[in-house]
């Protein structure tokens, strides 16, 4: 029945209470990613996300995604980026796109392609405005990506890095040393006072995600939220 299908879909898309880690949490991305292997899928997803949050009262958003995660059925990273920009054009929300490189094994070439696309499409506003590094932080440490971000700096690309979520404060220090002006999550800076000071002194913006931090067990108790 339709009800039954809806329940099953909800289950596939919802992080269970039994979720124990970021790696567990990331499994919920499998189905949405599968639906975004075409330009129509990506364009529609960007448009729907933007419209949805606009109706909730959000006045500005930076929608981020990893173009390399959408190439399984023959779409190129560049076509994925163009599709996202198409979706962005259709919304009334003031929004930009951030392109994510991914932590992982054997995808170095794909990350450099994302970097080159960020450079090609980079604008001040109304399109691609920066780059990010996302994915399984505990398995693939920030320290592996020095050369990638050296190149981003050389190109003058602004970037943020997911750090201090599944790995400790050292990951945040590393990201800041690479030149990240913002940190995705950063909740574990509280484990090291010197990293807290570094964040404060350099005016690093922390992009906080309290809901997912509870779901991934990056924070057990909201009293401990930095």
Residue ranges with predicted function:
Residues 3-5:
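Short, small-residue-biased leader/transition segments that mark boundaries at the very start
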Residues 12-39, 131:
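Polyampholytic, low-complexity intrinsically disordered segments
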Residues 24-34, 50-73, 94-100:
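Divalent metal-dependent hydrolysis catalytic cores, especially in the metallo-beta-lactamase
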Residues 61-63, 131, 183:
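Hydrophobic residues within beta-strands of alpha/beta enzymes
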Residues 66-68, 100-106, 133-138, 162-166, ...:
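Active-site beta-loop-alpha junctions enriched in small/polar residues
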Residues 81-90, 96, 109-130, 139-161, ...:
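Histidine/acidic residue-rich metal-binding segments in metalloenzymes
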């Amino acid at each position: 029945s339709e009800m039954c299908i809806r329940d099953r879909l909800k289950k596939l898309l919802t992080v269970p209470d039994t979720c124990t880690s970021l790696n567990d949490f990331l499994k919920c991305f499998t189905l949405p990613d599968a639906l975004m292997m075409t330009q129509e899928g990506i364009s529609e997803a960007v448009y729907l996300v933007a419209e949805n949050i606009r109706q909730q009262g959000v006045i500005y958003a930076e929608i981020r995604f990893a173009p390399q995660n959408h190439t399984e059925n023959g779409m190129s990273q560049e076509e994925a980026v163009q599709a996202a920009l198409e979706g962005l054009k259709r919304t009334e929300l003031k929004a930009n796109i951030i392109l994510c490189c991914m932590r992982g094994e054997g995808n170095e070439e794909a990350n450099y392609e994302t970097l080159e696309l960020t450079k090609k499409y980079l604008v001040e506003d109304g399109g691609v405005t920066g780059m990010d590094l996302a994915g399984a932080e505990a398995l693939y440490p920030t320290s592996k990506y020095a050369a990638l971000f050296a190149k981003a700096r050389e190109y003058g690309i602004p970037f943020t890095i997911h750090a201090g979520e599944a790995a400790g404060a050292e990951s945040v220090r590393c990201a800041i040393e690479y030149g990240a002006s913002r940190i995705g999550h950063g909740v574990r800076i509280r484990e090291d006072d010197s990293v807290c000071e570094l964040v404060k002194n350099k005016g690093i913006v922390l992009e906080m995600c309290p809901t997912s931090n509870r779901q991934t067990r990056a924070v057990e108790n909201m009293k401990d939220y930095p």
